[in-house]
């Protein structure tokens, strides 16, 4: 009795009308099993503006005005709230392209104009990526906006899933698909961009060939985010929305959750979170753990299950990042992490390390020494990506180049030098792998992925300071182990919660978990992405 697989229409609550996917199918009647029956039964959950004037008709977007001279529009591919998508032909060379034609008269609010401008900027920024639909140009006349893009006629990922036996991919084929989605997410995140609507309908195959590359499309809900700021609005598609989106405190991690949901579906043909109503789906997302017991999960490899579980961690800080996920053994290409991009979370950890108290830096160094290098594949990949000359250490120039890739943060050279100095514990002017691990470590993930091992590691780190083994770190023990001079008591204040002049194991673990930078919970201003980061 299976019915339509895909989720309800993408939603943006509280920030205006958006309908980014002109021809994607949406949820009709409810069914747990994937099927393509009744694929046309759709239900929109998007909030729309009511009334207003044709604001877009009064705006000159500054785009080229010679579309009709350059292209000839052909058959219709799909349509949405604001316009239509067509196949078109380049009059100069005969090449076929896709053209998204948007009716200015239907843009009745300023935010809808800003949405179009932002989507064009995003396509311009990402258009050179191998797994993002190519951007050619944007045009306008008095009536329409024309966004000219690469034509991908291989169909949606959704259709490929539905065509598979039991709507399932083999693990090998699923890994190929997931790897391409993760590359898109990692590139977006480096640019300070969050896609915010990753789902099978928003990925197209370049051609109908079996090995065709996958291309991300539809950035209508995508947005740029300020460092240290979280999105408050609820956007996306119900089946793929992350818990933190529903809590109105979301960031780049939400894209990884969505890819985790897609991976689950690719491997078993079912959704991990399902209900007949949207509110029911949200309740499942917030409270339920994905099932890995029912068929076919017993026959799926432990590596695949481990990968999916680490993407579907409800606490975003403990979830793998997109770049980390590319280093996971299950998704690696031929056992190697090919072209792993620099991870924004690693760069962020290195920036934060400078702001940590001296005590926390010392505690993190002790914790890092308890971890075997073979457990640090993702950080080794990151270190190698930053170590351009492959000499086994990161120089000031290599650090500068790495930090420059994180587009939202425009750090001055003096700040880069400060970060390198904080990471360089032996003061030789370079950061080796051991020093790098201390600053780049994801402590929240250590606890989430293996709580028993976390208990052992944090205890081992604690014991390095607890010389007499009485279960507490005293100022004198800290002085003996660190060689610090002067008054030690001020150092203890951050960790000594009960103010008894010493640090217990629980206080020590709390110190390791804590972060000195906290994200502010504010709304993303509608025009922010147009004034900052490109």
Swiss-Prot record:
Domain Protein kinase residue range list: 71-331
Membrane topology: Lipid-anchor
Positions of Ca(2+) 3 binding: 466, 468, 470, 477
Highest taxon in the source lineage: Eukaryota
Record bears the keyword Zinc: no
Subcellular location: Membrane
Single Gene Ontology MF annotation: calcium ion binding
Catalytically driven reaction(s): L-seryl-[protein] + ATP = O-phospho-L-seryl-[protein] + ADP + H(+); L-threonyl-[protein] + ATP = O-phospho-L-threonyl-[protein] + ADP + H(+)
Binding site for Ca(2+) 2: 424, 426, 428, 435
Pfam families referenced in this protein's UniProt entry, alphabetically: EF-hand_7 (PF13499), Pkinase (PF00069)
Binding positions for ATP per the UniProt entry: 77-85, 100
CDD domains documented for this protein: EFh, STKc_CAMK
The enzyme's E.C. designation: 2.7.11.1
Domain comment in the entry: There are 3 contiguous domains conserved in the CDPK subfamily: a kinase domain, an autoinhibitory (junction) domain and a calmodulin-like domain. The autoinhibitory domain (337-367) inactivates kinase activity under calcium-free conditions.
Protein's name according to its UniProt entry: Calcium-dependent protein kinase 18
UniProt organism field: Arabidopsis thaliana (Mouse-ear cress)
Lineage: Eukaryota, Viridiplantae, Streptophyta, Embryophyta, Tracheophyta
Gene that produces this protein: CPK18
